[in-house]
Amino acid sequence: LDSAAVLKDGKRIGTSVMARFDFKTTKGEQLLVSTAISGVSMEGAARNLAAEVPDDDFDKYLAAARKNWNRHLSRIEIECGNRDEKVKFYTALYHSMLAPTIYADVDGSYYGPDKQIHKADGWTNYSTFSLWDTYRASHPLYTYIEPARVNDMVKSFLAFYEQNGRLPVWNFYGSETDMMIGYHSVPVIVDACLKGIGDFDAKKALEACVATANMDDYRGIGLYKKHGYVPYNVTDSYNAENWSLSKTLEYAYDDYCIARLAEKLGERQV
């Protein structure tokens, strides 16, 4: 089913195809349905299905999923005599891994914020970055238990910057939602760089961080640069919600992180 939206004569025409299937089943009968999706094309969905679900064997994929989750969850081992507390810990760890999510077909193709199809070559593209919520704890955790994924996440940020002119704030499947405040891709990038994680282009990362921090017409950044804080009683074209104190704190922290990255790279003139 093709649910792609089409832009025609300045109007967005969405097919928004939905389907419902009714089956006449008998009591105890089981149905096995294999599905696939793609953010790129119908053909991409077919390739994803062929690559990821070549057999109609539910138990096989259930076992593979369980093995994969155990592999990731076992990266932290705890000693605890209380089973309930152990269940709580690993349930919380599981929840921490539900996002960010891979956003690409099996061949690396994905739909970018510039409305074009791109291909991640040698890395995995990620999306669903709720950065205002996750930069404080989740992403630092990933640097210890999922460093390879952190490298791919930073590369995803930099690709987003190349395609959209700024780092993501709260990107979701090829688009920017602009939910919440700050530009918290920055501390995620800087944390990875200072810990020596990955092979991403650190110079490009610094460029992206500085460019994002200098979007004067975005959510009071120009006012913040002018005054050293975001005034509570002044708005700009993108500052209607104000939140002056929160923005000042978030911008100050992100800018501190940029300074640490510049220091690490020997860039004293940033």
Where do the language-model regions lie?
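Alpha-helical support elements that line or immediately flank enzyme active sites
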Residues: T91-A104, S127-V150, V190-G196, Y256-G266
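Acidic/polar, glycine-enriched structural segments that form the non-catalytic walls/loops
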Residues: L1-N125, A159, R166-V169, G198-N214
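Active-site acid/base region of carbohydrate-active enzymes
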Residues: V87-T101, D105, E162, S175-M180, ...
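Extracytoplasmic/secreted proteins, especially bacterial periplasmic and envelope-associated proteins
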Residues: A64, N68, D84-T91, R136, ...
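Second-shell loop/turn segments in exported
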Residues: A51-F58, S74-C80, S127, S138-T143, ...
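Flexible glycine/proline-enriched surface loops and loop-helix/loop-strand junctions
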Residues: D121-W123, T134, S138, Y173, ...
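Secondary-structure capping and boundary motifs in well-ordered enzyme cores
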Residues: D84-E85, T124-D133, T177-S185, K247-Y251
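A conserved hydrophobic secondary-structure block that centers on an alpha-helix together
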Residues: G14, E79-N82, T124-T128, Y135-P140, ...
